[in-house]
Amino acid sequence: MEVILLEKVRNLGNLGDKVHVKSGYGRNYLIPQNKAVFATEQNIELFEKRRAELEKKAQQALANAEQRAAKLNDTTIVISAMASDEGKLYGSVGVNEIKDALIEKQIEISKREIVMPEGPLHSIGNYVVEVHVHSDVVANLQVEIIPAK
């Protein structure tokens, strides 16, 4: 299935690219999420007319993402968790706990944006967690885990 991308999609292409994708990916994800349209001649003509508008919208989204990333880079969150004397947590600190700590600081974020490739954190200490606020912008969030009293 051929589609025209209406925005940048990670590991697929940029705005305006005509790409070949599997039918299920196109019909069930890209098109319903307004990330792409079918690559018909009529849609190609409509896209060319709307290209400037879509590029402006993409630039605004990138600028907003860079502002959010700057705010996140300057932020350190402190999470208190029950831990043993050796510093091992009685559980773990994952995406939900980090998201909740950011919401307490009035920073809106979705769980999908927080990336923890090694999985949840299991011990006390300072960590750097990646936050993908945009496909081109990655922020580094400082997370400090302290033992609960």
Curated annotation (Swiss-Prot):
<dbReference type="GO" id="GO:0019843">
    <property type="term" value="F:rRNA binding"/>
</dbReference>
<comment type="similarity">
    <text>Belongs to the bacterial ribosomal protein bL9 family.</text>
</comment>
<dbReference type="InterPro" id="IPR000244">
    <property type="entry name" value="Ribosomal_bL9"/>
</dbReference>
<keyword id="KW-0694">RNA-binding</keyword>
<dbReference type="GO" id="GO:1990904">
    <property type="term" value="C:ribonucleoprotein complex"/>
</dbReference>
<dbReference type="InterPro" id="IPR020069">
    <property type="entry name" value="Ribosomal_bL9_C"/>
</dbReference>
<dbReference type="InterPro" id="IPR020594">
    <property type="entry name" value="Ribosomal_bL9_bac/chp"/>
</dbReference>
<dbReference type="GO" id="GO:0006412">
    <property type="term" value="P:translation"/>
</dbReference>
<protein>
    <recommendedName>
        <fullName>Large ribosomal subunit protein bL9</fullName>
    </recommendedName>
</protein>
<comment type="function">
    <text>Binds to the 23S rRNA.</text>
</comment>
<dbReference type="InterPro" id="IPR020070">
    <property type="entry name" value="Ribosomal_bL9_N"/>
</dbReference>
<dbReference type="InterPro" id="IPR036791">
    <property type="entry name" value="Ribosomal_bL9_C_sf"/>
</dbReference>
<keyword id="KW-0699">rRNA-binding</keyword>
<dbReference type="InterPro" id="IPR036935">
    <property type="entry name" value="Ribosomal_bL9_N_sf"/>
</dbReference>
<keyword id="KW-0687">Ribonucleoprotein</keyword>
<dbReference type="GO" id="GO:0005840">
    <property type="term" value="C:ribosome"/>
</dbReference>
<dbReference type="GO" id="GO:0003735">
    <property type="term" value="F:structural constituent of ribosome"/>
</dbReference>
<dbReference type="InterPro" id="IPR009027">
    <property type="entry name" value="Ribosomal_bL9/RNase_H1_N"/>
</dbReference>
<keyword id="KW-0689">Ribosomal protein</keyword>
<dbReference type="Pfam" id="PF03948">
    <property type="entry name" value="Ribosomal_L9_C"/>
</dbReference>
<dbReference type="Pfam" id="PF01281">
    <property type="entry name" value="Ribosomal_L9_N"/>
</dbReference>
